[in-house]
Amino acid sequence: MSTDSYTPSQEPGSKRLKTGESVFARRGVSPSTGGVASAYGNESEKKPSWLQTNKSDIDGKYDKYGERRNAHTTTRDSRLDRLKRVRQKSAEREDVGHEGDEGDEDEGILPYIHLQAANPAIIHNEKQENYRTFQSRISNRENRDINSIVRAHYNQRTQQAKQQGSRVNSPIYKMRNFNNAIKYILLGNWAKHNPEELDLFSFLDLCCGKGGDLNKCQFIGIDQYIGIDIADLSVKEAFERYTKQKARFRHSNQNSNRYTFEACFATGDCFTQFVPDILEPNFPGIIERAFPVDIVSAQFSLHYSFESEEKVRTLLTNVTRSLRSGGTFIGTIPSSDFIKAKIVDKHLQRDEKGKAKFGNSLYSVTFEKDPPEDGVFRPAFGNKYNYWLKDAVDNVPEYVVPFETLRSLCEEYDLVLKYKKSFTDIFNQEIPKYFSKLNKNLIDGMKRSDGKYGAEGDEKEAVAFYIGFVFEKV
């Protein structure tokens, strides 16, 4: 295997597993209100026990945030028994957590099903001309705070995505697939459930966006999902995506590749609000019944919190109080080491306004102020740059995340670093193990022009900008 690509010994999909039937009955769906999308319908319909209203006084709920009662109740034993049987059956399969062939591809993968081509990279390049590249239209950026800009950007992203055309023709289509593969690997390796401590395998997705990681949650076999994001239209899209896949092929004799986990979604800012204050007004009793969780995930988002130390501490409070002991905090962020190398090696250029920047045809980083010559940012917070990624991020403010600062702060919140690697290293070291497990369309979407798999050209540098990390709650 070369250092920047992978050539498989066999084609993907030769040992594909099917996801087991859902153990939950189909829920009714009601329109979202108050900026919140719920996976549950009318109050008259029966809800899973972890979302039933707790009739006891929930004053002081924040003190209970790190506790959780046993989820077993007399009325739910039969459901939990069924759940355990299904999970045990899945565990006996050779490739646990493997996605099925149909119906569960990530957004951006589905259009690829209808392409007949020996080399996907060729078709991808030929059809890009019919695709509308994303451009945000955010006015008066100079006088808006970062929350306002980020919310507006991702809401516009959600709105425009439906008019852009097939995402298989996006100029960063292969890069999206590469990044998705990295997240599958991170979650597949580090998302662990402890059935002796918690009955249900639970997942808290901070900054969930449009629900791009829902398929990954099905892949790792979770039982319950909670998604929070600052962009209300993205939350609505995530909810619709979940309910569509939840309903898909629900008749037992058609197809089992639908979501088998329950989910709820809420709009909120996990950098300035505490999780109970976001969830409790809309789902009374959820903190008592659904927390702590096994995994907290923050994908491509934590860097927004480094605007200030207060925001980072609020985020880490949410993470540590949400996690059970032994639970994992899994995320992806820009690499401060990568940024430092660009500065120290003098790879910076000047834009038309004289601001320092680096990048290529796919991405760019433009600093608000000249960065320090040694690449070490002091103080560690508020070091802003504008990030541009073709067809995805349109010069949105982000902040440098000095990783040692993050690691040190995490230790204050009982979060110990277990893993940190660049996307390039993760791919090179882990893709051989995952090549036959991941969905064939996702794998095909990473096929290079030379027939190998991985990033090529300007994509190499764009993906090397990121790292994956895992912290464990002790």
UniProtKB/Swiss-Prot annotation:
- Which InterPro entries is this protein grouped with? mRNA_G-N7_MeTrfase_dom, mRNA_G-N7_MeTrfase_euk, RG7MT1, SAM-dependent_MTases_sf
Protein residues bound to mRNA: N179, N180
What GO CC annotations are associated with the protein?
A: cytosol; nucleus
* Catalytic activity, as annotated: a 5'-end (5'-triphosphoguanosine)-ribonucleoside in mRNA + S-adenosyl-L-methionine = a 5'-end (N(7)-methyl 5'-triphosphoguanosine)-ribonucleoside in mRNA + S-adenosyl-L-homocysteine
UniProt lists compositionally biased (Basic and acidic residues) regions at 56-100
Which controlled-vocabulary keywords does the entry list? Methyltransferase, mRNA capping, mRNA processing, Nucleus, RNA-binding, S-adenosyl-L-methionine, Transferase
Positions that bind S-adenosyl-L-methionine:
K183, C207, D229, D269, Q299, Y304
Q: Name one Pfam family in it.
A: mRNA_G-N7_MeTrfase
For this protein, the record's PROSITE patterns field holds: RNA_CAP0_MT
Site described as mRNA cap binding, located at K210, K216, R241, H303, E398, Y466
Which BP terms does GO give this entry?
A: 7-methylguanosine mRNA capping
Q: Which stretches does UniProt call biased (Polar residues)?
A: 1-12
| Enzyme Commission number | 2.1.1.56
Region (Disordered) spans which residues?
1-106
What role is this protein assigned?
Answer: Responsible for methylating the 5'-cap structure of mRNAs.
What PANTHER family does this protein map onto?
MRNA CAP GUANINE-N7 METHYLTRANSFERASE, MRNA GUANINE-7- METHYLTRANSFERASE
| Protein name per Swiss-Prot or TrEMBL | mRNA cap guanine-N(7) methyltransferase
Natural source organism: Candida albicans (strain SC5314 / ATCC MYA-2876) (Yeast)
